[in-house]
Structure formats: structure tokens, C-alpha cells
Amino acid sequence: MKDKIQNQNFMHTLNAEQKKAALHTEGPLLLLAGAGTGKTKVLTSRIANIIHQNLALPHNILAVTFTNKAAKEMSERVHNLINCYGLNIGTFHSMAAKILRDQIENLNLGFNNRFTIISHDDQLTLVKDIVKLKKDIDAKKYTPKLIHIIISRWKDQGLLPNKLSTSDTNLPLQKIAKLVYEEYQKNLLISNVLDFGDLLLYNNELFIKNPAVLKYYQEKYRYILIDEYQDTNIAQYLWARMLASLYRNICCVGDDDQSIYGWRGAEVGNILRFEKDFAGATIIKLEQNYRSTLPILAAASNVINNNKNRHSKTLWTDSSSGEKIKIISCLSDKEEARYIACEIDKLVKEERYNAGNIAILVRAGFQTRSFEEAFINSAIPYKIIGGLRFYERMEIRDVLAYIRISLNQNDNLALERIINVPKRAIGAASLNKIRSYALERNISNFAAIKEILEIGNIKAKSYESLKDLLTKIDNWYEQFIIDTPINVVKAILDDSGYLAMLKEEKTEEAFGRIENINEMLRAIAEFNDIHDFIEYSSLVMENEVLETNYGGSVTIMTLHAAKGLEFDVVFLPGWEEGVFPSQRSLDEDGEKGLEEERRIAYVGITRAKKDLYITHAESRKIFYEIVRSCPSRFINEIPDEITIRTSSMKQYNSFYKF
């Protein structure tokens, strides 16, 4: 029996190319979807059509996104079209985590399915600890942060330590990183924890070593859809290719012109070689834009057409009207900020736009300070997107560590984080004794403490504290089996003394931390399984960019963070050589770097729906130095006939207030 279609006319709302993609059901499909062309609508319509035509049951369909927000939106939109249950919609990491939760023991490496996922900060802490132990590593020259970046890159490329080639370890830093990588993986194994790179890395190892396991998931996921394919790294690409190799019913949606995450492992070549990977693939282009005006689309197309390594496509719209793009020359970066502040003030006071629909998108973080000053002086409400995220705050990470050690007693990082929080009279000497004992016997710190307590080889005060803590951890584990996550976490907060510690501080900071913990409890209350919450919180930290409404404040954010968003009015400041395109990108990656910078410009331009301002300064203060500058080459790539080019000085008399 066919699942019930909620909206019988959903195909009639698609344009010709969208409908062609939604009706395509057999064989590989590459959907080249330009900015604002309705790709999510097509993806969800395609899923609904596959189910409605009885080509697959919902649980045989796998849809992969890059963020939890995108996964949730896709799921909701599918359910608005067709009444079905059991769809597999999630991020790369969440889907990989589910597979490993069921299959990790088939890797025969020593992991079990009670593994936990450690955060970025915990990964860095572990690297630091390893570097400290290796006395021959100069930590000032070869910093743990750099070593961690290299290890993460290798994982994104699908490379375990034993698969690194000579070319991967040519440089002294790479040689050291390999040594640390080997020790790092051993530590993860002892603690029964994985980092984010491991999720795809071990999935791929699992599929290669266990053809029967791969076949099981190929049969399970007969239809595969991948969103934002241009942002995939090598490990994600290999994972998708293996899963799709049996039935070849894979639909990859992306826009190579919006591939802007090369610095974090994204490989634009994945989308460019799709036709080679899947012979006979169908290619459909979505070029009709439903977001921006004609001048904005013309600007975007003219800029991106200067890139050589791309699939040819041209955005167009039914609308023939639209404001010309304003390109403003300013004397300095301070004047640039004042001009933008005054222009925003005028737009809002004239009731042309709401402040919440206006954004300033910068290429680099150092550009934001001048806007903060200008907005404060002009009493313009604003918010800077960035900084510390919720799940990265100290108190949240502490509570997460308590939960993790309760679920997985071998989690060394979690135990070390909470062992003395609140204070338990466990000094440095006791901690070192525990670490050394564990290291010598190749066991976890938790197991080491148990053995030390049995021997009695520790100070009396520490003995009582450690015995009490271990007993509580055992109790919390048992409680998680029989009680709801929210009840157990509340018990942890009370029994551990953590909440009492904050209450005793009686400071504004402590009060804020308690409020954050209460907010965390509200999130936990939505989960029936604590493992689901732990995975969710970890993946949110890695994947989410912005999950908030725009309110009545102007948004200031980087161009990278703005991808996927849209605003009525967009200001693009700092379009000068050296700032944008970034000199660092040009120096390090040459033509490849320039093409990525141009894609970033394309993303910035296409965030605007109605009005676009591009500004550049004749001089700019960069790290305390005044630097003379030239307009960005990208400005010269925008045709004169769709622009109004002027100087901010011409407008001083009309609206600047002193």
C-alpha cells in the first residue's frame, strides 16, 4: 500500500528542471544546484516520489546532510509531503556513529559499543599530554595545535597511521605528527573513545575489512541522497561511494561554486569527478534562482565565471527588476564602518528594512572591531555570530564529562576533567601515581584507581575521596540503565556536589553557569537515551553554525559562517587586495587559493535577496599597522552597468552625524 501523500500537488509546484530531478529514480544523479534554486525542495520531493512509487520503503532510504539543523528541516519537509516513518536522515557523523554503535566490535581493534565521542577540546588535551610525555619534541616549535590539525587532516583523508606514505611524512613536523598520531590512537583505544575523524575513518575500515557488513548496509540503504556534496572530504566521499557501489542509486546535490571549506578538508574534486566515479551518471542543473534580484545574480555569475575549474552554470530569475549594487570607496576602515552604520540607520528609520534582515559579512575576524565601535556609537543593536558555543562552555563540558565517565568508565579524559571538580583532596602526586600505574599496565585510569585502592597504596584522604567517587560512578551507571536521562543527570549534579559548588560561589558568573546547566537539563529532557544526547551534543559542537532567529539586531559574521543563510540586505566590507582575496590564501595555494577565494565572494554575493553593498577602504588598520590598499580584483569582475560606484565622502553632508 502506498504511503499517504499529504500534498497531492507537490510535483506541480516544481519547475521543469526540478521536476526532472525529482522524477529521476534509477542510477546515479548529480544535481548541480546554484544558490537559491530550491535544492531542498527537490531533494524532499524526490524522497516522497520514491516512497510513493513503492520503489523503496522509508527505511531503505538514506539522506545525509552536514548539520543537524539541515537534517531536521529535511525530515520535516518530507513528512509535510508524505506520511511515512523510518527514514534515515542525519549528518555524516551521526549516521557513521550509528553504524559503529552496532558494528564496531567487527573491526577487532578492541573497541566496544559503549564508546563515547570526545570533543575537539578533549582531542587537543590528549595531544598536549602525549607531547609532554615525549621529551624529544620541542612543543614550542611543533605545537600540539599544529600536530592535532595534521592528524585531523590525515583522518579526513581516510589515513590511519599505518597507511601514511613517505610523501605524507616528508617534513619534520609531519614525522613528529605521525609519532603522536600512533600514540594518540592507542590512548583512544585504551579509553574506548573516538574522535570525529574516527567515525568515518573506522566506518571505511569496517567496510573494507568486512564485505558482508558492507553488503548489509548496501542492501539497507538502496537509495542514497547526499546534500552539499561539494563540502565532502575524502573520507566522506569514500564512505558514500562504497555504500552506493551495489545499486548505484545515489543522488548527490551540490554546487562546486560554493565549495569554500578547503581549509578544513573539503575536496571540491569530489563533485568535479562524479561522472568518472559513476559512469553513465545523469547531470541536472538547477539555475533558476528564487532568492535574489537580477543585478545580484548577474554580479555573482560574472565573478564566478572567472574560475576555470567548475561546472558551467548561470543563475537566472523571472524578475527583471532590482536595485543596482552599491560599490562604495572609503578613506579608511573606520570610515567604512561609520558609513555602513549610518546607511543601516537610514534603512531602518525609513522603514525600508528591519535590522534583523541586515547582515555584514566579513572575510576575517579582525574586521569586526570597527563595526562594534560604530554600532555602539550609533546605538544600533547587533550580534556577532561566533565565540564560545553553548556546549563548549566550562560548566557544560564538566557535566558532559560526568555523564561520559558514568557511561564509559575507561574514558580517561572525562575522568581527569572531573576527578577534582569539586575539590576532592586529590593532589598532583596522587594523579601522577594513577597515570603512571595505568601507563605501566596499559589500563585505563579508572581501572588503575580500583587496583590502587585495593592495594591501599595512597594517602588516606585521597583514598576516601576516590573510593566515594568510584562508588558514585558505578551507581550512576546502574541508574542510567533503569531511569530516565534527566533524572540521572540531576542526581549526578546533586551527588557529585557540582551544583552545590556553584551555589556556594554566589557570584554573577556562577549564577550564569547554573542557568546554563538548567538549559542543558531542558535539552536532556528531550532524549530517552543518554547516548543519543551525548552524540547529539558532540555533533552539534562540530557541525552547527547558527541556530537562532534574527530578532531585531544586525548580524555580523564571517562569510564562511553565512553559507546557507539569506538576508534582505547584505554589506560586504573589506573588498581589498590582501584582505579579500586573502593574501595568505594566495601565498599558500596560488591559483587554487584564488579560486576558493572567488567562491567565497560568490557565496557572499548570493546571500543578498534585495540589496547589496560592497565597500573597500583606501587604508586599513591591520594588527596595529596602517596599510594602504587597492580595490579587490573581484570588484573589477562586476559589470559597471549593474552597479552604482561612489565614495562615502560624497554622502557625509547628507547623513553623517557628528
Swiss-Prot record:
It catalyses: Couples ATP hydrolysis with the unwinding of duplex DNA by translocating in the 3'-5' direction; ATP + H2O = ADP + phosphate + H(+). Pfam families: UvrD-helicase (PF00580), UvrD_C (PF13361). GO terms for molecular function: 3'-5' DNA helicase activity; ATP binding; ATP hydrolysis activity; DNA binding. PROSITE patterns: UVRD_HELICASE_ATP_BIND, UVRD_HELICASE_CTER. Its EC number is 5.6.2.4. GO terms for biological process: DNA replication; recombinational repair. GO terms for cellular component: cytosol; DNA helicase complex. The keyword DNA-binding applies. NCBIfam families: pcrA (TIGR01073). This is Probable DNA helicase II homolog.
